[in-house]
A protein has these predicted regions:
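Cys/His-clustered metal-coordination modules, chiefly Zn-binding fingers
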Residues: 295-299
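Short capping segments at the starts of secondary-structure elements
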Residues: 46-53, 116-124, 224-226, 238-244
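Accessory beta->alpha helical hairpin/"wing" motif in late/C-terminal subdomains of nucleic-acid enzymes
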Residues: 9-23, 69-97, 159-182
Length: 299
């Protein structure tokens, strides 16, 4: 076995094997890394200025791994990337590595879309979506897919239960069972390119006409477009995951101190919410909206 063969060699040989494995391990981690985080690492390598949120990523992700060192002088922090990491980053330009990165990005987009649409889904369903229309004959597709699933687990995007992939938003066995039961007897919705574009970066809402109507009502009340988007992203998640209805959403808005000027504003908001909720793709419908399935709009 590999363990026995390692025991039979000397210390210097073991050190050589370990040192030769480090670049391969680094390369694998960077190939399968979230693209936004990789861009931050490249900006650090090139000594470009980074935003406060990017500084947080460096301090939380790269400094603890020893990829980046931080130096503080006169209350200013400077980041310096290690030479070994720099060499691996430069290697990412190679064609074979680029193909692996394209594969990783594609799988990440499909994974985020499936998590958004289904909550729980079979690993076979993910594999079928990844394979559709793609040609990865020159690479070990199954091995790379398994590596990516472990990366997504480490990033706390998913967990795995048997052959099922489970969103980390599912917090209990009861919730898991409820979603599984809600899928029984239903066909899953198959995402389009539009869906993948909408959900590939982990967003919960698709900015449809129904969404835009709710957004306009909310922005009119709070006079803050960015905050309105953040609120609706959070509310959208609750519709998808927990089947929130109008009373729960209105209570949430009141908890956030959203005040409506008059009864007409409230009626306009509830009407817009009714149409939006009806059109939202949700876990309990296996990725479909209630509007698509022509179910009654009980809002």
């Amino acid at each position: 076995t590999e363990e026995t063969s390692l025991e039979s060699i000397g210390r210097k040989e073991k050190e050589h094997i370990l040192l030769s494995d480090i670049p391969k391990h680094l390369e694998s981690q960077m190939i399968f890394m979230d693209l936004n985080k990789l861009k931050v690492l490249i900006r650090v390598m090139n000594q470009y200025p980074i935003e406060p949120m990017e500084t947080t990523i460096v301090n939380e992700e790269f400094v603890p791994k020893g990829w980046v060192f931080d130096f503080v002088e006169d209350n200013e922090c400077t980041f310096v990337i290690t030479e070994q990491v720099r060499q691996v980053l430069m290697k990412l330009k190679q064609d074979d590595v680029q193909q692996q990165m394209e594969f990783a990005f594609g799988v990440r987009c499909i994974m985020n879309t499936c998590v958004r649409l289904y909550g729980v889904f079979g690993q076979d369903l993910l594999a079928d979506m990844v394979l559709e229309g793609q040609d990865y004959e020159s690479m070990n597709r199954d091995e790379n897919l398994e590596t990516l699933l472990r990366v997504f687990e480490d990033e706390q995007i998913i967990s795995r239960k048997g052959n099922n992939i489970v969103s980390c938003k599912i917090e209990s066995e009861e919730q898991y069972t409820d979603i599984i039961n809600s899928h029984i007897g239903k066909n899953n919705y198959m995402p389009t390119d539009h869906d993948i574009e909408a959900y590939c970066f982990g967003k919960w809402v698709d900015k449809t006409a129904e969404y835009d109507a709710v957004y306009s009502c909310l922005k009119r009340e709070i006079k803050d477009s960015e905050q309105a988007e953040e609120m609706l992203e959070e509310i959208g998640e609750r519709i998808v995951v927990d089947d929130w209805s109008i009373p729960q959403i209105m209570n949430c808005l009141y908890d956030w101190d959203v005040g409506f000027d008059n009864p007409q504003s409230v009626r306009r908001m509830t009407k817009s919410l009714s149409e939006w909720i009806y059109s939202v793709r949700r876990w309990s419908e296996y990725g479909y909206s209630r509007k698509e399935k022509q179910l009654p709009n009980d809002q």
